[in-house]
Amino acid sequence: VSTQVFPTNADQSPLSKLGQQIALAGLVVYVLLAPHSIAASATAVVIAGIGWLIRTLGTGSLGLRRSKFDLVIVLSLLWTLASALLSEEPRISIAKLHASWCVFLFYLARAILNKRSALYLVALLIVSGSAGALYSAFDLVRGRGVVVEVIANNSPLHQVGIQPGDTIWRIGRRRIYSVADLDQTLKLTQPGTPVTVGITSRGEQVERPGLVLTPAQHQQPSPSGIIGSNRNHQFRASGWTRHYQTFAELMQMIALLALGLGLAHLRNHGANRYFRVAIVAASLLTLGLVFTAMRTVIVAFVVGAGVIAWRSLRGNYRVVFTFALFFVLAFGAVVVWQTRDRNSLLLGDPSSSLRMQVARVGLSRIPVHPIFGHGMDAMKMHWTEWGFPGKDMLHLHSTPLQLAFDRGLPMLVLWLWMMILFWLTIARAARSSADLSDTNSYGILLGTLGALTAFLVSSLVNYNYGDAEVAMMFWFLMGIAASTDSDRSRGRSRSS
């Protein structure tokens, strides 16, 4: 990798240069794997962190300046710690504190990247996300799992509520494509050891734990006890990830990054090759998003794309783009209608009804612990006791509501303060960089602004801030935006 990509303070010694190279290599691996695997991408972040540490030892400096975000981030972390200590279930909530490490990506990106290296990483992220979108299309054509036609009375799969018409697509971490595949996988499990079954039922994907085979069932020629010959071609796409909701949120943010870069070039240079490449990538990523049939995330994407278009396009371009967004909504509606419960478009499906019931119970319990909340993940131990319906949800499906419930109303105020601060800062930075000489920085900031907008809209009805892969991507993009703006501002100061 060219040393021109590095911040200048990394060239002071061989040790600092080595650390910078390791850190940048770790971030390259992260963006390549972030749309697909949390374990591999988290490992890449650890490698990048080690590189940052080596560079710090070589330079004697973290390479960070104070920012306007530091205070609210520190206060949020401290409040989260206090909430965990005062939780209804301290042992569970304290163990959950490890999820707060995602904010490390914000400071890592700020310390390691400049606007040029940020552009390279964004480009790699878009390429990797596009590969995931293409795989989703292939996965839909190929089909997934096995559709249950008949289930025997003595089938162990009754333990997890399997019914005719359901699709079994995963046992533990292994994907299933036929009854023979299912039987072979069950025979590889240990008798008496519970495993989790991935199921698609009425268009909804759930993971149901608790399947246990007896030694006698384990020895049967067909331990599954089901008959089925077809794969499911009408499931909610999830790429190489485990769940469609995670995949949808990631596709949404990456698609808006690509769109921001494309429309920045369209505004400043017309329909050049960079615009064409970016708009093709954005279209692929949008297709991957729509195939998840996530109603709220599709709507959030359209809102985020609308913000990007409104701030970058003029005249006829706005009209054309508005029609394109209506097409996305219409196509999304068709996919939702084909994939999910027929009443999903009118919010009359069981999933929507359950969400409303859960939200009402959650709201009614916030006054019980309004300051420090009930504690992160404490509801998993008291779901039925506290009056929540069902057994598959186990969270409130709303980031603001979940934060208030888990960590108290002050945490919700801190989160709103932080989100508003990010939005206003990135919006001002994008506006000031909208000139011919800084198109790529403008595109990154514009795309990040759209991604942040969509993330916030989606957060109203999805607990996306509690999804580790999505939270990592959120903090990484905020770090890229801060790094791009800081590097751009320093360059402008030097030129003046």
Predicted regions and their residues:
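Transmembrane alpha-helices of multi-pass inner-membrane enzymes
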Residues: L24, I47-L53, I254-L257, L261, ...
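A membrane-periplasm/extracellular boundary helix in multi-pass inner-membrane enzymes
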Residues: V127, L134-R144, S283, F291-T292, ...
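Hydrophobic transmembrane alpha-helices and their immediate junctions
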Residues: G262, N272, L409-T453
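A conserved mid-to-late transmembrane alpha helix and its immediate loop/hinge
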Residues: S238-T246, L363, F372, D392-I426, ...
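Hydrophobic alpha-helical segments of polytopic membrane proteins
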Residues: L105, I112, A258-W337
